[in-house]
């Protein structure tokens, strides 16, 4: 979904991992995108950083924004297993079901595209599940990196398979990066 409507507030934040784009509708986060730019393996990858556009958010939205940054940094440092910030998911009924089911995959666990299709009641819709996850508007928060191919291989990932491997290793879903070739 495109968040170019005036009802959305977009704020850019940079940490040691790179550039992040947060999009809010009121006090709910509806978009989080990672543009990269830094080596995610860096020991300083989770350093807190001031947002580049602090003045764009005020009041309760500012509180949620700061909570989102804090939770994101804690997660990227391996110290947070589940996000608690309020979110809003946009999409068709099918897409919403897929994204909500993906949020229920526990930290350190994986599901296959096929298993997710079965969970949402469309057992033959593996490809549609993959397309929905490819367009995940809340990267990291909706943990589509926890969805792997039926052969238990890495599968695709919008942010790149190297990052997917790193996240799954950090979560302990695989013992090492070579387990997902």
Predicted regions, residues:
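Regulatory, non-catalytic segments
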Residues: 124-136
């Amino acid at each position: 979904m495109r968040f170019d409507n005036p009802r959305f507030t977009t704020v850019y934040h940079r940490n040691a991992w790179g550039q992040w784009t947060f999009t809010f509708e009121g006090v709910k986060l509806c978009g989080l995108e990672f543009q990269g730019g830094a080596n995610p393996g860096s020991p300083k990858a989770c350093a807190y950083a001031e947002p580049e556009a602090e003045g764009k958010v005020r009041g309760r939205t500012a509180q949620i924004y700061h909570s989102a940054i804090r939770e994101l940094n804690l997660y990227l440092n391996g110290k947070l297993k589940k996000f608690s910030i309020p979110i809003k998911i946009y999409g068709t009924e099918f897409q919403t079901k897929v994204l909500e089911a993906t949020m229920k995959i526990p930290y350190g666990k994986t599901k296959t595209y096929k298993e997710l299709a079965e969970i949402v009641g469309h057992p033959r819709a593996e490809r549609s599940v993959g397309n929905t996850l490819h367009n995940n508007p809340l990267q990291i928060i909706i943990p589509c990196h926890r969805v792997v191919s039926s052969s238990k291989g890495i599968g695709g990932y919008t942010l790149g398979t190297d990052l997917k491997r790193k996240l799954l290793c950090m979560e302990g879903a695989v013992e090492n990066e070579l387990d997902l070739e």
